[in-house]
Amino acid sequence: LASLTDQTQLAAATAFDIVFAEPDRTGSSQLQKIYSNDEALVEILSRTIDHDDLFAQSIANHGTVVLGLAPNNKTESQNYLGKHGMVIQGDDPKLFVQPYTGMQNNLDKLEAESAGLGSMSIGNDDVIVRTLPSFENINGSLVPSLPLEIVRVAIGASTYQVKSSNASSEEAFGEN
């Protein structure tokens, strides 16, 4: 994956629509745990860069990599640490978008080096795509969709401007 990321250096943005939630099982840090009784192998592995560290370094060097997040209602997540600003006008947009209690994150080291994080969801439970949400409410945080975050990173924007009903005398008509 690091090599693939390096090959996309000229792309305006590169995105991964999968979640890297667990350490690479073939990385040196994982192999050291598996073969902890083989001191010679552990010594060699300790001098080898871990695959996840190499991937994180590649993401950082690229500068415009966007990673996906998987919203769910199975867990309660920590606060979303977006890489963008947010200007909200009008009613609270979280009232109008799909709420989730949690999300499956990527490894911390990968998220720290990424340029953006976007939600990967089709906004319903029946797996039929009717609409693609622009934002989702994940544990009280407004999280952009992966496609929207890719565009933000590709054009170099730093902030989202979200206009909800009542922003410019527009009425919600009691609908959420």
Regions found by a protein language model. Give the residues of each.
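Non-transmembrane functional regions of envelope-associated proteins
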Residues: L1-N176
